[in-house]
A protein has these predicted regions:
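Residue-level signal for mature regions of secreted extracellular proteins and peptides
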Residues: 14-15
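Membrane-proximal alpha-helical signals and transmembrane carboxylates
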Residues: 2-9, 18-304
Length: 304
């Protein structure tokens, strides 16, 4: 077979794979987001789909949802309610149910991975506890979560649910501003942090690289690029282009208050941690060998 013919055949095969073995993408149900909730012992699953028949200035999404005894059953019933064949290749957001723990995250993550692998653009949130109507709220929830990702340069990929054997960390959606952060350890209750501690946790987990948060009891605002360096368990937090703004009349020591709050948050996040969320034990064992107990973590805040 000549080289041009081989290239043409490969192109045709790739096109068939992308469109679903000959079925045009425009004829399929394109899934953009999957939401899970848990109510009264049962699961609810909602698929947010691209509405390819919508007018350009109208609503661009449609939804289908179902309830089941398990998350897999609820998702399967929602899929069965659609007349067309589903396409998960453009799925870029999944919301885990509020109150989920590590085991739930593993189960739902595996279910999503089976549907959308390798899904490099798929991001994960934990849904808030509000009582949402899927038909009325799913599209706005999707847009809000994607906006939070852009504004805070935040991303938790699906693969990050599986990078550690004893825990994972996931940002949490909130309706006002910013985001929460969930530390989900194996065989332990979920832990949620908010505000500046949530953003510090996201930075330490490698899921964000900036701060944009109120602190000092809401009297000051910090906006900064952040980089983390680690030597053994000594963490350095490098703040670049840092802007500290007073939201009150008093001219306080804004830098001092920020450092104090970061130190307090770091101590709380690393005290009696049920999993190595910030990889400090991992780096210590790489330096000194497996099984060596790591010293207490320390934090230094550096303004650059």
């Amino acid at each position: 077979m000549s080289v041009p013919k081989a290239k043409a055949l490969l192109t045709v095969c790739a096109a068939l794979l992308l469109c679903g073995c000959g079925q045009a993408l425009s004829e399929r149900e394109i899934v953009r987001a999957v939401f899970f909730a848990r109510q009264q012992g049962a699961y609810s699953a909602c698929l947010l789909l691209a509405d390819q028949n919508a007018e350009s200035d109208g609503v661009q999404y449609k939804t289908v949802s179902a309830r089941g005894d398990t998350a897999a059953q609820a998702l399967h019933l929602a899929e069965d309610a659609l007349p067309g064949r589903l396409y998960y290749g453009l799925l870029d957001l999944a919301a885990l149910p509020p109150g989920c723990d590590w085991a739930d995250a593993q189960t739902l993550g595996t279910l999503l991975y089976d549907k959308a692998q390798p899904a490099p653009e798929l991001s994960v949130f934990v849904l808030d506890t509000a009582d949402h109507s899927w038909a009325a709220d799913a599209a706005s929830l999707y847009e809000d979560m994607k906006a939070v990702e852009r504004e805070y340069d935040l991303h938790c990929g699906l693969q990050q649910l599986f990078t550690q054997a004893d825990g994972c960390a996931v940002p949490g959606y909130r309706t006002d501003s910013g985001y929460d952060f969930y530390l989900l350890a194996k065989d332990a209750p979920a832990r949620r942090v908010s505000g500046l501690p949530a953003q510090l946790a996201a930075v330490l987990c490698g899921q964000a690289d900036n701060f944009f948060s109120a602190y000092h009891d809401g009297q000051a605002l910090c906006k900064s690029e952040v980089n983390v360096t680690v030597e053994d368990t000594a963490v350095q937090l490098h703040l670049r282009d840092c802007t500290l703004q007073s939201l009150a009349d008093a001219d306080d020591d804004l830098q001092g208050f920020l450092c104090a709050e970061l130190q307090h948050a770091f101590a709380a996040l690393t005290h009696d941690a049920k999993a190595d969320f910030f990889h400090l034990q991992f780096w210590h064992e790489n330096l000194y060998g497996v099984g060596r107990e790591a010293p207490a973590p320390t934090l230094a805040v550096v303004f650059e």
